[in-house]
Structures are given as C-alpha cells and as structure tokens.
Amino acid sequence: MMNISGPREGDFITIKSYKHDGSLHRTWRDTMVLKTSENALIGCNDHTLVTESDGRRWITREPALVYFHKHYWFNIVTMIRENGVSYYCNLASPAVLDKEALKYIDYDLDVKVFPNGEKRLLDVDEYEDHGNKWHYSADIDKILKHNVRVLVDWINNGKGPFSKEYVEIWYNRYLELSRQQ
C-alpha cells in the first residue's frame, strides 16, 4: 500500500519486479519520487541502473516517468525521447511499497504505445507459456484482460499518464527537484 508515511517527494526508491512464482525478474535503482498518495506513486528515473534476473546490468537511455496505482493491474512507464513520448505499460499486480522497494508481479503482457499513437500488445506467447507453467488462475486471467481494456481506454482518451499535461507537469517537476539535489 502506498501512502504519505512512505517516501517523500525527492526521495529515491528502488523498484523490483517479480514473476508469478516469486522469482526476482528485474530491479531499477534510483527512481525519484515525485508524488505519493493513498492510491498512487509517480516517479522519474534517468540513466538508472537496471539489473536483470540473470545478473546482466544496463543503464536506461532516457528519462522515464513511472506510474503505479494500488487498484489497477498495470503500471505505466513514460519514456521521454527526442523523437517524442512513448509508453511501455506492464500488465502487473498492483504495487506494494515497503522499506526495501516498490514491488509488483509482472504478468508478461505489455502494451507499447509509440510516439505516433500506434499501440501494440506484446509478449502474448510469454503470457501463455508462463500461465501454463505457473498455473495462472482464471481469476488472474480475467483481471488482466479487464485491465488491458481499461489501459486501452486510458490510452485512447488521453487519461492520466497518457495526457500531454501529465508528461509536462511531472517531467518539469523532476527537473526542478534534480536541480535541488
């Protein structure tokens, strides 16, 4: 659960994604918290160290706003690139924030939105493979499919992270806070 007693604006947190079987999938270091509320967390990272489950490490190439909500089974990464804004949306459990990190279960399916507005549903085969391997329940399947529809509605209607204003407001806030560090 995310709330005011957690990190404050300008604090840095780690983000950890897990798979359904409990194994660590990926870790992002140093995401700056821009806003927390009872239901959501907005953050930003730039040139952040990412560690894969197999130990490989890489650095992100561009600033990315992140959006997590405790009631939705997706999170949204807004990548701010020279050729425009693109989005990578993970179908995932609602995030949990503890002293160690913000954590969620990644359920394989992703929606990518390109700067021209084109949308692609990715990793359907991986979702089916992992669903069989780890026995995703019918309830989880139903929840995830419903959340794909919610996500597409947000995309099509420019809601929340998909609005131009959101990107401007939160990226500018990140730049302000970065100058104060």
Curated annotation (Swiss-Prot):
Key words of the record: Hydrolase, Magnesium, Metal-binding
One GO molecular-function entry: nucleoside diphosphate phosphatase activity
Catalytic residue list: R26 (proton donor)
Amino acids binding Mg(2+) 2: D108, D110, D123, E126
Enzyme superclass (EC): hydrolase
EC number: 3.6.1.15, 3.6.1.6
The protein's required cofactors: Mg(2+)
Positions of Mg(2+) 1 binding: N90, D106, D110
One Pfam match: DUF402
UniProt catalytic activity: a ribonucleoside 5'-triphosphate + H2O = a ribonucleoside 5'-diphosphate + phosphate + H(+); a ribonucleoside 5'-diphosphate + H2O = a ribonucleoside 5'-phosphate + phosphate + H(+)
Protein family per UniProt: Belongs to the Ntdp family.
NCBIfam families named among the record's database cross-references: PRK13662.1 (NF010183)
Its biological purpose: Has nucleoside phosphatase activity towards nucleoside triphosphates and nucleoside diphosphates.
Protein name: Nucleoside triphosphate/diphosphate phosphatase
Source organism: Ligilactobacillus salivarius (strain UCC118) (Lactobacillus salivarius)
